[in-house]
């Protein structure tokens, strides 16, 4: 799929948070997609016509970006183009949680991607504010299936192990690097990358599993370079962009169907 992505170079429209916009754009370019970064409400209809997919990230949410996201969903949905929602921090505030629910109620979201706390909060399950470090009675497999069923989406839960579900099947994806949790924007770029893969119009469940595996493998490859050069967080960020731009052979990442 990565080869096809690089041949097609899909245009991915991002309504993302201001902290990570440059990193997300560079990451998409490294993968082989073309980034478009805009949250101007007046141009949502025009951009929906020329873009191949939309990624919405609520990391720096405000009243204007809420209206922008709603307007964008309306136009992308009308054109039957894929939309990824990354409900960043939706378990942390009423505004984020309420906005996420409103966007999901549009029934235009194709993929809902987040950590355990974020996805859990959208189905009434408390997993703690940090998500990845939380302890909860409901398993990740149960949460991701429930999310997919409730909102009729492909649910993607990221963490040390990723889980992807269409409400029936669940795939787990292992591998990756601990450094992903130590840089800003890894999850935001992941959501944009999900949108780029969806634009290829392949089976969405398989596409998301493949994307998660490739992303984790690139992170693993970057970590090896960090170790070889006695680096740390900063060098990982640059090696990760390099790894995304190179051919990615799945060696460390494993996709497994859960029963």
Curated annotation (Swiss-Prot):
<keyword id="KW-0460">Magnesium</keyword>
<dbReference type="Pfam" id="PF02110">
    <property type="entry name" value="HK"/>
</dbReference>
<dbReference type="GO" id="GO:0005524">
    <property type="term" value="F:ATP binding"/>
</dbReference>
<feature type="binding site">
    <location>
        <position position="185"/>
    </location>
    <ligand>
        <name>substrate</name>
    </ligand>
</feature>
<protein>
    <recommendedName>
        <fullName>Hydroxyethylthiazole kinase</fullName>
        <ecNumber>2.7.1.50</ecNumber>
    </recommendedName>
</protein>
<dbReference type="GO" id="GO:0009228">
    <property type="term" value="P:thiamine biosynthetic process"/>
</dbReference>
<comment type="function">
    <text>Catalyzes the phosphorylation of the hydroxyl group of 4-methyl-5-beta-hydroxyethylthiazole (THZ).</text>
</comment>
<comment type="similarity">
    <text>Belongs to the Thz kinase family.</text>
</comment>
<feature type="binding site">
    <location>
        <position position="113"/>
    </location>
    <ligand>
        <name>ATP</name>
    </ligand>
</feature>
<keyword id="KW-0067">ATP-binding</keyword>
<feature type="binding site">
    <location>
        <position position="37"/>
    </location>
    <ligand>
        <name>substrate</name>
    </ligand>
</feature>
<feature type="binding site">
    <location>
        <position position="158"/>
    </location>
    <ligand>
        <name>ATP</name>
    </ligand>
</feature>
<dbReference type="GO" id="GO:0000287">
    <property type="term" value="F:magnesium ion binding"/>
</dbReference>
<keyword id="KW-0808">Transferase</keyword>
<keyword id="KW-0784">Thiamine biosynthesis</keyword>
<keyword id="KW-0418">Kinase</keyword>
<dbReference type="InterPro" id="IPR000417">
    <property type="entry name" value="Hyethyz_kinase"/>
</dbReference>
<dbReference type="InterPro" id="IPR029056">
    <property type="entry name" value="Ribokinase-like"/>
</dbReference>
<dbReference type="GO" id="GO:0004417">
    <property type="term" value="F:hydroxyethylthiazole kinase activity"/>
</dbReference>
<keyword id="KW-0547">Nucleotide-binding</keyword>
<keyword id="KW-0479">Metal-binding</keyword>
<dbReference type="GO" id="GO:0009229">
    <property type="term" value="P:thiamine diphosphate biosynthetic process"/>
</dbReference>
<comment type="pathway">
    <text>Cofactor biosynthesis; thiamine diphosphate biosynthesis; 4-methyl-5-(2-phosphoethyl)-thiazole from 5-(2-hydroxyethyl)-4-methylthiazole: step 1/1.</text>
</comment>
């Amino acid at each position: 799929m990565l080869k096809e992505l690089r041949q097609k170079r899909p245009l991915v429209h991002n309504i993302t948070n201001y902290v990570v916009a440059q990193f997300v754009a560079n990451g998409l370019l490294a993968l082989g997609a073309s980034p478009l970064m805009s949250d101007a409400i007046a141009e949502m209809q025009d951009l929906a016509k020329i873009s191949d997919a939309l990624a919405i990230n609520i990391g720096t949410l405000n009243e204007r970006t809420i209206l922008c996201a709603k307007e964008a969903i309306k136009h992308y949905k009308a054109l039957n183009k894929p939309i990824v929602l990354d409900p960043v921090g939706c378990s942390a505030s009423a505004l984020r949680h309420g906005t996420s629910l409103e966007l999901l109620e549009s029934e235009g979201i194709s993929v809902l991607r987040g950590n355990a706390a974020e996805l859990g909060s959208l189905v009434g399950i408390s997993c703690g504010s940090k998500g990845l470090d939380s302890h909860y009675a409901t398993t990740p497999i149960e949460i991701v299936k429930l999310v997919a069923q409730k909102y009729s989406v492909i649910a993607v839960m990221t963490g040390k192990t990723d889980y992807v579900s269409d409400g029936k099947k669940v795939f787990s994806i292992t591998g990756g690097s601990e450094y992903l949790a130590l840089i800003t924007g890894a999850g935001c770029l992941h959501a944009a990358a999900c949108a780029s893969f969806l634009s290829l119009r392949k089976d969405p469940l398989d596409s998301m599993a493949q994307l998660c595996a490739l992303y984790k493998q690139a992170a693993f490859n970057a970590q090896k370079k960090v170790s070889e050069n006695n680096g740390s967080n900063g060098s990982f960020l640059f090696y990760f962009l390099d790894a995304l731009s190179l051919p990615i052979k799945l060696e460390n990442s494993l996709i497994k169907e859960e029963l």
